[in-house]
């Protein structure tokens, strides 16, 4: 009997191709047109998106991207490529492809790349440690659309999330310990996760529970008292309520209350990107210090660290 050949598809959100208003506009249009991201009535949303949001936000967001852009592209793309290459080296007999929900390389190009390698089975690993319908759900939807157009469909194993995976928690804990050793132990470790509208959670998205799971497991691995670890949510968009407490408002409050030293980690981001390097490491640092805080450090994402790559290898091994 012929042995099954397995390929791995690493999936992430995506990024503009360049830090220009035109490239950012193309990316935001695709991203904000996904009903998994914004489920507002199209009759109301299309005029607002095309007539107001894209013209106004694209130039401003392009400047933010330019402030963090790297020689090889956006940070998310650079680190995602490093993850793909490192995992391929770790698993030399297994094809590894990278696909993005929005922008390029697309999920479809990643699937085609694996099919060109004659794989019979694809393990899909969305690089979102905590499930949400707006991220992991978007990968699932697009994958289904892609495969619906194929005459032959490979076997699919879809990893929902890894919020409490032992290797993931240990990698986070070791990263925190290294930061504490370098900068000193802070008064508070703040874990900032990307937010979603509160309505999504009310309708059944278990994302906040998965974030709480990671927070609890990480605090336990570090042996930190509950009052020394706080969970917040960042990057809200629009006017409706999002998951709370909000990261920026919390940092302002903590600075005003006299908390002197904070370190911030974003466990939900598999790779550093605009939201971590600009929003958290820069904007929110200014918020905290401007409110009276004394010392603020951002703990980088796991990116392509050996521990994280080993976690990926172990995670997909159960499905190969």
UniProtKB/Swiss-Prot annotation:
Q: Which PANTHER family match?
A: FERROCHELATASE, FERROCHELATASE, MITOCHONDRIAL
- Catalytic activities: heme b + 2 H(+) = protoporphyrin IX + Fe(2+)
Q: Where is the protein situated, by its record's location annotation?
A: Cytoplasm
Q: Which source organism does the UniProt entry give? A: Shigella boydii serotype 4 (strain Sb227)
Q: Does the keyword Cytoplasm apply?
A: yes
Q: Name one Pfam family in it.
A: Ferrochelatase
* GO CC, one annotated term: cytoplasm
- What gene is it encoded by? hemH
Q: Name one GO molecular function term.
A: metal ion binding
Q: What is this protein called?
A: Ferrochelatase
Specify which residues bind Fe cation according to the UniProt entry for this protein.
Answer: 194, 275
Can you state the subunit structure given in the record?
Monomer.
Q: Which family does it belong to?
A: Belongs to the ferrochelatase family.
Q: Which GO terms describe its biological process?
A: heme biosynthetic process
EC number of this enzyme:
4.98.1.1
PROSITE patterns to which the protein is assigned, alphabetical: FERROCHELATASE
Q: Which domain of life is it from?
A: Bacteria
Q: What does this protein do?
A: Catalyzes the ferrous insertion into protoporphyrin IX.
Sorted alphabetically, which keywords does the UniProt record give? Cytoplasm, Heme biosynthesis, Iron, Lyase, Metal-binding, Porphyrin biosynthesis
Database matches in InterPro entries: Ferrochelatase, Ferrochelatase_AS, Ferrochelatase_C, Ferrochelatase_N
Per the record, the major location class is cytoplasm
The record's HAMAP family line, in alphabetical order, gives: Ferrochelatase
Q: In which pathway does it act?
A: Porphyrin-containing compound metabolism; protoheme biosynthesis; protoheme from protoporphyrin-IX: step 1/1
